[in-house]
Amino acid sequence: MRIIITIITFVLTIAVAPAQSHGIYKMPPFERAVCCIKFFEGLHQAKDYPYIGYGHRIQPGEHFRLPLTRKQADALLRRDLHKLCKMFRSYGKDSLLLATLAYNVGYGTLMGNANHPKSRLIQKIESGDRNIHDDYIRFCRYKGKVVPSIRKRRKVELLLLFHT
């Protein structure tokens, strides 16, 4: 119950008052993204394998001494997010927003792969359409079902990182 109240307070605080009055908006955008990911992912435990730290999925050939410290988890998150930002560099001001989303849903889900076409979100951004709110929020499903906490996460990400 405590975590639900904390999440609701966080979301309401961001959504209600003007952006300039909040300390989080004074942070560089990359730091906002890191804070947002940490808040919603939490620090993963052994039971969350193959996810460690703040949502890093262990890849073939990667080996880590577990459990990770918060400092190690933070460094791993930053490394992963920087890597994704580079992958989305051609999207300019949207690169951090897309990297943050890809951190959670996967690069292939957005950009397409053998199993999925390029997402509608990416298609709209590539065409210059800035009306992406609904398409971004649509990435709130797990196993085909809408998850309210993921939906809230997407709204917070947009509030913190989207530039019209």
Question: What are the roles of these predicted feature ranges?
Answer:
Residues 49-52, 56:
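Early exported N-terminus immediately downstream of N-terminal targeting peptides
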